């Protein structure tokens, strides 16, 4: 679609007909100060909103980095069963997103808003299920069903939290600049949440390092006391210690989850933005879904970030195993993961400045491709702890961009949709839930396929050293596959039509519409006095 297309439809259908509206005239519009103050968000509101995003990232990081290795080395499941749990759990999680999005779109407005009740009700059951994911049940035959059940339950309840929270971006302010600022706050806290998740899970579990069996000497009677990185690990006692460590870490994360949800609920006021656009009318979910999925910029944005997200998910899901076995840093893998997340957190403000200065599309190209040389470097050089830390710092910068940019660009697509479909409203949850659906489905595919690939390569549970075929598979999973997916995603992104000029134009038209609606409301209030 050509730049600005759809503006004529918008202006002729909803704006006053007494004066024509051109792009140049719109640029001169100055909103009243009272209206600007109404839409302004305080720093406190932005911080509280941002804190609400931490639980999803804290739990997601812990699951993404550590669940695979927990199922394989602590719960002692075979790789095939672990791959089934990871794939089915993530696939189920993906299916729940459009379902919850539909239910949220049908939720009536309450005194707490439309999104907040979902966030409040889902919190406590979610943390209970999360804790039980990290418990090793005393039954051997039912282990797989135990993890599959509580993993799926947690993902469902987490969706009931995250989809309304994501859509809340459109209900905290009608001002695009305010939403972008709140999104930057949110991304900073969310990436900091990944640091917290990595630190809590990694450092607590790292105190009870995973025991392993000496697979090079199967007839050696000292297998229960093996040497790993110059330290002796008693096998049975350490398995028990590590199980306790995982439960302690999950309990701490569960407590943080509850605190963050409470801060969000009491610190953010959800605005009834839909009431401000009286000219709009609600359409059915099915029609809304067809409109959303038929909106070209949204489809292109989702497809592009689907492939780039899949690349980083492959890296995330396999990097701990890669560090532990291929690089041989059994006692350092949690610290290397922590460095990646700290680097990503520090880079978020820089990327926010960059996208404001050079535009969002440029930020995508630079930010996502930044990681590619380091993905290649980490599998090309000989195993070196110093090189691993350098690569981790550099890769974290790209991870920060991957966190910020999709959520910063989705509101632009929603605004563009509103201008091209001015009589349709209430589809924010559909936009966000289907984006999360596709990324979560990609995550399930990446974890399931990668764990299955390790099974075919001959991965052995609990051993100190894996075979060459396993190490080669891990190199492909953290380097060649992600690089190829990033290239494909960026090729699709080249067709994304919303540049900075179109984004600003859309924003000014929306503000003009809201201004006229508010003026009409004021006239309605004054009308009885005038006629009297």
Swiss-Prot record:
Its main location: membrane. The keyword Membrane applies. Disruption phenotype: Morpholino knockdown of the gene results in early postnatal lethality and microcephaly. Glycans are attached at residues 214, 220, 229. One of its GO terms (biological process) is lysophospholipid translocation. InterPro entries: MFS_2 (IPR039672), MFS_trans_sf (IPR036259). The keyword Transmembrane applies. Expressed in the developing nervous system. It catalyses: a 1-acyl-sn-glycero-3-phosphocholine(in) + Na(+)(in) = a 1-acyl-sn-glycero-3-phosphocholine(out) + Na(+)(out); 1-(4Z,7Z,10Z,13Z,16Z,19Z-docosahexaenoyl)-sn-glycero-3-phosphocholine(in) + Na(+)(in) = 1-(4Z,7Z,10Z,13Z,16Z,19Z-docosahexaenoyl)-sn-glycero-3-phosphocholine(out) + Na(+)(out); 1-(9Z-octadecenoyl)-sn-glycero-3-phosphocholine(in) + Na(+)(in) = 1-(9Z-octadecenoyl)-sn-glycero-3-phosphocholine(out) + Na(+)(out); 1-hexadecanoyl-sn-glycero-3-phosphocholine(in) + Na(+)(in) = 1-hexadecanoyl-sn-glycero-3-phosphocholine(out) + Na(+)(out). This is Sodium-dependent lysophosphatidylcholine symporter 1-A.
